[in-house]
């Protein structure tokens, strides 16, 4: 499918040609943006369709562009919040490791906005989790901890409100 062809960080020329052929066989484009969004692929799909020179129906192109702009903005806000959280943890002498999208967006993707993120995941030592919760609660625009899903793994969901966006932070 088109989404399968677009589900790659980079698209070499041969892959772009395959993507273009696949796109050429699509009769109904209406559901493509919502499917791409559902699978976290809207920004990558737009990037690869453009690179392949695919003639995308105008309404679909607009939807993909809007989704891409939204993800770019959200990732910028989340990245800024992540930098603040990591700086606060470092200042407190707490070692941490960024997991999942927060790391992958910056390590694998040519532009972080190509990797949609829903939250930030940070790993800390079990015995420092309570201190992390206190640090996060003291940050500007902090939101109270929502819940600890599993006390054995100290999985804590909390967050910050930044630039009109809720930045969910999961401490593992």
Where are the regions a protein language model picked out?
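Conserved NTP-donor binding/palm subdomain of two-metal-ion nucleotidyltransferases/polymerases, i.e.
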Residues: 1-118, 124-172
């Amino acid at each position: 499918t088109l989404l399968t062809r677009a589900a790659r960080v980079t698209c070499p020329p041969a892959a772009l040609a395959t993507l273009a052929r696949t796109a050429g066989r699509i009769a109904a484009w209406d559901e493509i943006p919502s499917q791409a969004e559902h699978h976290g692929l809207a920004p990558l799909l737009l990037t690869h369709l453009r690179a392949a020179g695919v003639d995308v129906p105008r309404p679909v192109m607009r939807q993909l562009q809007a989704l891409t702009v939204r993800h770019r903005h959200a990732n910028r806000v989340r990245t800024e919040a992540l930098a603040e959280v990591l700086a606060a943890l470092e200042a407190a002498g707490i070692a941490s490791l960024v997991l999942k999208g927060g790391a992958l967006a910056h390590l694998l993707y040519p532009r972080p906005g190509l990797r949609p993120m829903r939250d930030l995941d940070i790993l800390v030592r079990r015995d420092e989790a309570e201190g992390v919760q206190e640090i996060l609660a003291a940050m500007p625009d902090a939101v109270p901890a929502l819940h600890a899903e599993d006390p054995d793994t100290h999985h804590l969901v909390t967050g910050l409100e930044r630039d009109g966006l809720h930045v969910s932070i999961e401490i593992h």
